[in-house]
Structure formats: structure tokens, C-alpha cells
Regions:
Chain B
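Metal/cofactor-centered catalytic core regions of large enzymes
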Residues: 2-434
Length: 208, 434, 231
């Protein structure tokens, strides 16, 4: 009864030794500034969003002012994977392989409704969101997003890049789902959890 | 109607004695004309195995997610096997679960370069199925929409074709012109690319006031860009050298392979759906259909370029003849009643409810309406069983049938020619894979 | 030297230049003259002729389709040289058979004709291919097979075109195939990711490249028995 003594687990330590020094923060700033302002995109453009991406890269909206005019179609030379367009299941291993071929540091932007959630294509053929295949940093909604929308998403990504710290050890680790970890959810449990929202086996949606 | 066809002539060398395409060498000191000389004797490729290389599905120059597997003898293509389906999204299946007005949103996304043209095509097909005659104003607006979308699609084709050959600047010029059309469309229907501008029985919205001035401004300034691009490309020796004599299809082959649109017309067959099976009163507009005589990539470029000019001509006539009057038909069972009536009269409210919740129901039957899309003969085949959702919605994709001919066209050409030939077909994977 | 004479569409057509059709009747419009010619030439194969919204639909017996289409292509008074589409329709009513539909155009005569053949559900869905008449049938028939499971006899390379070859859920456009597929989303994703994108060369492609000879013995045996590596 009453207050119990605080255990070690509940105390967060803010000792000076745990913080970064001045040099480390300046280095972080420099590296992040360089990365954010020269993100080389890998346009994984499939459908209509790819046309809006091309319009964003063209003269009127001009991605070159953000340092992104050099489209690298080889994933090995790219920083950002911009998935512009719908991804069907046949294309799923391709985008996964492209993501694996990109070297760290890498980020990804899911452009458009179809890349983010499957969009208007809730059917047998389309992946319901590329975040089921690759990790996504920024989702840009729209069908297709206006060039200003995509630029807003790119600016958000730049903010995210600038807030990274070299001291965060785990940021740039590649994660494969480890079946033995507690983060892994087996497929049968996924089906069970998703059941109230309807899936193809039960077709509980209202016949749409 | 005046001249039916415009023969586009160019003295090409075509094929040489060995049956290989002749190359036009870079201009040296001729100063004026094109120096068409036979290239020096072609060395036979060194004896060796054939190489199998894979282009795509992720590739900058495949115009979408297309995969080409090429068997190469040195650098010459011996065989080409295309693989498609990487953008298959089940359009036709989902069309069976949507009302006719809802399907219009899907027609934007399949050929996304010609989105408003697809909306028009689908609305025409649905109106044939319903047995509706649309108003005169709607017809002219749809002609304006179709021609604007033809210009948009050809500009993307031009830009990306130039990039594939190596010229980057026309891409920027083309996209700048497209931004003007985007602004016009945005004022009209609210969206740039995925317009969903038509409805069964009319249009989603009438043009706002002042829109026609914007259109006339575009018509006035667009030919200058065309002249600029023409100056830079058409007689350019590098351009001619990279495109002449490639991917030749004879007229009989082209018809048998089911090619349509500029691919077919470049081979000398003057089939244009607007002239041969007209719709939207196209027979009353005065325009020419360019027809090539060589069937190669250069002729396809010339045909599409000329089509851009003809589209401007049609736009001018349409802008001059736009009649006043209602845009939508007056049938409340099919098209939404005006909001003022729907909120005040009971009957209109019921009609509004029925049209939105259930959707208009056509009689039992089927219809196939084909339009001339920038890619070719685009058709929507719809079968109705009397309910609000079609039994079958089939898209006849011109790029699908055009692309099937690529193994025939690239045989015997070099690897870099494969890219040029692929670009000249003007494919849209969204339409091919649906 | 490739220089072709311009082939004018409608060179054999008679009458006034074509105009936009207006006020087309639902049924019983003017049929295409080819329908009458077909009924005279193939009286037993033609089941019936309908005119729906101005378009002539000829129902042909499934076993005579190839002969009929061959005649339509070759005969000088018909000359249907352009195959616009090959597709199929399955109705929601389970009793109604599946229809295979061909859209033919005669460019010299400016005519459009729809040929339909009915295949009973429950029997093997097979019909003759028109690949030898029209090369455009190549991919169109492959797509019809992919979406409906209809086999085209005589097609040189009938395999799936839009879905991947080991797609196990079935034929998507059939009415008994649910909109979202038969498997759950996670299972669909797992099957899709299980394809190895790099091992996607088919038997045909490997044999071209002479890589076949360099494969290990057991793999060659498995491949020649028909196992697929990928596409």
C-alpha cells in the first residue's frame, strides 16, 4: 500500500555521458543535410502516379530544386524508392528484390493510394499496400497525388532524414521477420485479426 | 470533307541487299540535304553462343512494367519474348461489381494517358447500351475532351520517345504544354489526370465561364511548340538515322496482327475509327488522317506528329461550334437531377436516391463501341442483364494487340533499336494488363 | 526497299460515307449483309442471328466456328481481315452457357460482325483457335484462357499471360471466383513472394540460350518432364 520504491526499470537516465557531444551532433547535421538534399530517387513507377511523378520532375514543379533530378533506375545507386502506382501480386517479388538491392541508407515513399493501401483495387490481383512487402517511410495520399502533394511528402521525408542520429544503432538495420521473435505474427493469426474487416475467404463485405 | 489522307513522303533507304535495315550516317560536310549513303560492309558477328538478356520489368525505357527477354547474337536480336501482366489489377472483374457511373472512375486508370478519352468512350458505350441520345452540347464537349486527351497522350509519347532515343529537351517542352491542359481540365472537372469527367447521359460538369478563352489560348500557342519540336527533330540526321527502317510492318501483316491506330496508319492502311465508324458526329468535322508509306518507326513518329496538328484543327472547329443548351439529358432515372430540385421535390429526391444507391439500369443487351484512342481502336464491350452492374465489361486494349507484334518487329535489329521500336508502339501498361 | 501503297479502308464499300449512328433500335435493326450470306453458306452451323443495338450477332455452333471464320476471312465478298477481339462472357445465371465472342471487322467493306459460340458449363471448355487465320488471336486467346480457363485447340503457346504461370487460385473472371480471390490476403502475398524473380526463365528460353546443356543432370531431367522454373 502506498508508494513503493521506484525500481531501476522506471528511471530514465539523462546523464551527460549518455548524450552525444558537440562534434557528433555537428557531424549528424552535416551528414543528414547532405543526404536530405541529394536524395536520388528510384522511381518504381507503374501506373498513373508515375505520370504525375514525371510531371513533378518536369519544368513546372521541378524536383531538381530538391536535389532529386537524377533519377537512378538502378537500385544500387539510389537512395529513395518512390513506389508510384499500383503493385499487383505478380510485381510483388520484383519490388521486394529491388528494395533488397538498394544499399543503406535507403528510404521509401509510397506514392498514391494504391501503393499505400491498395487504393480502389480491393481485389484478387493487387497488393493491399506495399508496406506488406517493404518498409515505408512516407505515405503520400491521393489518386494521383498532385505534384505539390508529392513534394510535401518529399519534404516530410527530408525532415525525417534530418532527424536521424548516428547514435541510434538500429535505424539502418535490415529487418527480416524472425519467426521466433514476438514481433512475428503467424498468418493464421493475421487472418483471425483481420476477419472483422472482411477477407476473401469469408467475403463479409457488403457485396460491393 | 476534303483530302482524306496525307501521304507522308520521305526517301528512305529501307532495307539493303542482305535484308538488314540500312543506317543513315551522321551528316558530315554536305551542308543541306541528308547524305544517304550505303554503310560500309557489315562484318559478320563472331561465331559464338547466343546470349539471353532480360529487360525489365523495372527498367526506365520499357514504358511501364514490361519484361522483354531477348536472344542476342552479338548485338543483333534473334528472338524476343515479351512478358506482361505485371500491372494486372483486375479491372474487368471489378467492373462486374460496380454500377455504370462508378466504372467511369476505373476507365481513367487503365489508359491513364488518355483518361478523359476513356471516360468518353465508356460513356458512349453505356449510352448505346441504355439507348440514350445525348445532347448536342455534350457531343461537342466530348469531342473537345477526346482531342485534348489525344494531344496529352501524344505529348507523353513524344517526350518519352525522345528520351529513349536520347533527346531530353522535347520531354520538358511537351510536359510544359501538358501542364496547360492539366490546368484546363482542373478548371473543368477538378482533377488533372484521373478526370472521371463523363457520366452516363452527360458530363460530370459543364465548362465554367471563361474556360473557352483558356482553350482558345492553348489552341493559339500550341502550334508554336510543335514547330519548335519539328525543327529540332524531324530532319535531324541522328533522329532519322536512329528511326528510319526500323520495325517495318507491311500493310497485310499489320492488319493480320490486329494493329490499329498510328501503328497501322504508318504502314499504309488508313483505318481510323473516327472516319470509318464515326461517333460524336466526327464526320462533320474537317480533318485529315495522316498515313505513312514505310511502316517504320520514323513514319510512326511523323503520323503521330501530324495527328497533333490535326487535333488542334478539330479543337478549333469544336470551339467555334459549341452550342448552348443543357449538357445532360433530361431523364432523372439515369442522370442525377439538379440539387435544387432534389432537395425540394419528393420525386427528384427519390430519383436521386435511386441513381446514387442503385444506379441506372439498362435493358438486357450488349454493346460494343469503339473509339479512336491515341493508341488505336479502343473498345468497351458491355453485356447487361438488366441490373445496375454489368455482367461483363470487356476492354479491347489497343496497346495489348499492338505489343503482341513486337517479336515480329525487332527480329534482326540491334539491341538499341529494340528500345526505339518499343517506344514507337506507344504502349501503356495499364491498358495492356488491366 | 519498303514503300507501301496506301490501302484505303472501305474501298469495296458501297453507299454514302459513314455517319454517326443515331437512334439505334434495341432489337430488330438492319442486320449486317454477312449474316444472310452466312446463313446461306452454313445453314446447319448458324444457330441464330440477332441484332442488338445495331450490331449483328451470329450464334455459331462451337464445332464449326473455325470453318465459319475461315470463310469470312477468305471469301472475296466478305473479307473480314481484322480480328478486333476474342473474349468470353459468363452470365450470372448458372444455367446459361459461357459464350466465346469474336469481334470481326471488314476494313474493305466497313462492316462489323460479332460471332458467338456457346460452351456448356460442366463440360471441358475447349474451342478451336483462330491463330492460323489471324495472328492477333495469339495474345487475345491466351488472355481468354488465363481469365476463363477456355482452351483453344491449335494455339501454339497457350499459357497464362496476365497472371503468373503457377497461379493457383483459378481463373479470375469466372463467376464462381470471388472478387478478392480464394485465398486470404496473407496467403496470396506469401504465394506471390515465393516466386523467385531471377529463376524466371521458361523452358523455351533456357533451351534457346544453350544454358540447358550446362544445367545439372537432375535439373535437366526435371525440366524435360515439364516442371517449370518460373514464368
Amino acid at each position: 500500500m502506498g508508494l513503493s520504491a521506484p525500481s531501476d526499470r522506471d528511471v530514465v537516465s539523462y546523464t551527460p555521458e549518455g548524450q552525444e557531444g558537440w562534434v557528433a551532433t555537428r557531424l549528424d547535421f552535416l551528414v543528414n543535410w547532405a543526404r536530405a538534399n541529394s536524395l536520388w530517387p528510384m522511381p518504381f513507377g507503374t501506373a498513373c502516379c508515375a505520370i504525375e511523378f514525371m510531371a513533378t520532375a518536369a519544368s513546372d514543379f521541378d524536383l531538381a530544386r530538391f536535389g532529386m533530378e537524377r533519377m537512378s533506375f538502378s537500385p544500387r545507386q539510389a537512395d529513395v524508392l518512390i513506389c508510384a502506382g499500383r503493385v499487383p501480386f505478380k510485381l510483388a517479388p520484383i519490388i521486394r528484390r529491388i528494395w533488397q538491392q538498394m544499399p543503406q541508407p535507403k528510404w521509401s515513399i509510397s506514392m498514391g493510394a494504391c501503393a499505400s493501401t491498395g487504393g480502389m483495387f480491393d481485389n484478387y490481383a493487387v497488393v493491399q499496400g506495399i508496406d506488406t512487402i517493404i518498409p515505408v517511410d512516407v505515405y503520400v495520399p491521393g489518386c494521383p497525388p498532385r505534384p505539390e502533394g508529392l513534394i510535401y511528402g518529399i519534404r516530410m521525408l527530408q525532415e525525417k532524414v534530418k532527424n536521424e542520429r548516428a547514435a541510434d544503432k538500429g535505424t539502418r538495420d535490415e529487418m527480416e521477420p524472425d519467426p521466433s521473435s514476438q514481433l512475428y505474427i503467424p498468418p493464421s493469426l493475421i487472418d483471425e485479426l483481420g476477419e472483422p474487416f472482411g477477407n476473401s475467404v469469408n467475403q463479409t463485405r457488403s457485396g460491393l | 470533307m476534303t483530302r482524306r489522307t496525307v501521304n507522308v513522303e520521305l526517301s528512305t533507304t529501307g532495307l539493303d541487299a542482305q535484308g538488314r535495315p540500312q543506317r543513315v550516317p551522321i551528316l558530315t560536310d554536305d551542308g543541306g540535304g541528308l547524305a544517304l549513303q550505303a554503310p560500309p560492309g557489315i562484318e559478320p558477328d563472331l561465331e559464338g553462343e547466343h546470349m539471353l538478356i532480360n529487360i525489365g520489368p523495372q527498367h526506365p525505357a520499357t514504358h511501364g512494367v514490361l519484361r522483354l527477354v531477348l536472344e542476342l547474337d552479338g548485338e543483333t536480336v534473334v528472338r524476343c519474348i515479351p512478358h506482361i501482366g505485371y500491372l494486372h489489377c483486375g479491372f474487368e472483374k471489378i467492373g462486374e461489381y460496380r454500377q455504370y457511373n462508378q466504372i467511369i472512375c476505373w476507365t481513367d486508370r487503365e489508359d491513364y494517358l488518355n483518361s478523359i478519352g476513356n471516360n468518353v468512350a465508356f460513356a458512349l458505350g453505356a449510352e448505346r447500351l441504355f439507348g440514350i441520345e445525348i445532347t448536342e452540347r455534350c457531343k461537342v464537349l466530348r469531342v473537345i475532351a477526346s482531342e485534348l486527351s489525344r494531344i496529352m497522350s501524344h505529348l507523353v509519347w513524344l517526350g518519352t520517345f525522345c528520351i529513349d532515343i536520347g533527346a531530353f529537351t522535347p520531354f520538358l517542352w511537351a510536359f510544359q504544354r501538358r501542364e496547360e491542359i492539366y490546368r484546363l481540365l482542373e478548371k473543368w472537372v477538378g482533377a488533372r489526370l484521373t478526370t472521371s469527367a463523363t457520366r452516363v447521359g452527360g458530363m460530370a460538369a459543364d465548362i465554367p465561364s471563361g474556360w473557352m478563352d483558356g482553350l482558345r489560348q492553348f489552341i493559339r500557342t500550341f502550334p508554336h511548340t510543335l514547330d519548335e519540336i519539328d525543327r529540332v527533330l524531324t530532319k535531324n540526321a541522328i533522329w532519322v538515322g536512329r528511326t528510319v527502317g526500323l520495325g517495318v510492318m507491311t500493310p497485310e501483316e499489320a492488319v493480320n496482327w490486329g494493329l490499329s491506330g498510328p501503328m497501322l496508319r504508318a504502314s499504309g492502311v488508313d483505318y481510323d475509327v473516327r472516319k470509318d465508324f464515326p461517333y460524336l458526329d466526327y464526320e462533320t468535322y474537317d480533318f485529315d488522317v495522316p498515313v505513312g508509306t514505310n511502316g517504320d518507326v520514323y513514319d510512326r513518329y511523323l503520323v503521330r506528329f501530324e495527328e497533333l496538328k490535326q487535333s488542334v484543327r478539330i479543337l478549333q472547329q469544336a470551339a467555334d461550334r459549341l452550342p448552348d443548351g443543357p449538357v445532360n439529358i433530361d431523364d432523372p432515372r439515369i442522370i442525377l437531377p439538379p440539387k435544387s430540385k432534389a432537395t425540394s421535390e419528393m420525386e427528384s429526391m427519390i430519383h436521386h436516391f435511386k441513381v446514387v444507391m442503385e444506379g441506372p439500369r439498362p435493358p438486357i443487351g450488349e454493346s460494343y463501341v469503339a473509339v479512336e484512342s491515341p493508341k488505336g481502336e479502343k473498345g468497351y464491350y458491355m453485356v447487361s442483364d438488366g441490373t445496375a452492374k454489368p455482367v461483363r465489361w470487356r476492354i479491347r486494349p489497343p496497346s495489348f494487340v499492338n505489343l503482341a507484334a513486337i517479336p515480329k518487329m525487332v527480329e534482326g535489329h540491334l539491341l538499341s533499336d529494340v528500345i526505339a521500336i518499343n517506344a514507337s508502339i506507344d504502349i501503356v501498361m495499364g491498358e495492356i494488363d488491366r | 526497299m519498303s514503300r507501301f501503297e496506301v490501302v484505303k479502308t472501305g474501298s469495296s464499300a458501297s453507299g454514302a460515307p459513314p455517319t454517326t449512328q443515331k437512334n439505334v433500335p434495341h432489337r430488330n435493326g438492319e442486320p449486317n449483309p454477312s449474316a444472310k450470306a452466312l446463313q446461306e453458306k452454313f445453314p446447319s452451323a448458324i444457330e441464330r442471328v440477332e441484332v442488338v443495338w445495331g450490331e449483328t450477332v451470329v450464334f455459331v455452333d462451337a464445332w464449326s466456328v473455325h470453318e465459319v471464320i475461315r470463310w469470312l476471312h477468305d471469301d472475296e465478298s466478305q473479307r473480314y481481315d481484322f480480328l478486333s477481339d476474342v473474349t468470353a462472357v459468363e452470365y450470372r445465371d448458372a444455367e446459361v452457357p459461357i459464350e466465346v465472342v469474336w469481334h470481326l471487322r471488314s476494313l474493305p467493306f466497313r462492316r462489323f460482325l460479332r460471332i458467338k459460340a456457346q460452351l456448356q458449363k460442366g463440360t471441358a471448355l475447349e474451342i478451336e483457335s483462330v491463330y492460323d487465320i489471324y495472328r492477333s488471336a495469339d495474345w487475345l486467346e491466351r488472355e481468354c484462357f488465363d481469365m476463363f480457363g477456355i482452351r483453344f485447340r491449335g494455339h501454339p503457346d497457350l499459357r497464362r499471360i496476365l497472371m503468373w504461370e503457377q497461379y493457383r487460385e483459378g481463373y479470375p473472371l469466372r463467376k464462381d471466383f470471388p472478387l478478392r480471390g480464394r485465398f486470404s490476403r496473407s496467403e496470396q502475398l506469401r504465394q506471390a513472394l515465393a516466386q523467385n524473380p531471377e529463376a524466371r526463365y521458361s523452358m523455351e528460353e533456357l533451351s534457346i540460350a544453350d544454358a540447358f546443356a550446362e544445367l545439372p543432370e537432375d535439373m535437366r531431367e526435371r525440366l524435360s518432364k515439364g516442371e517449370r522454373t518460373g514464368e
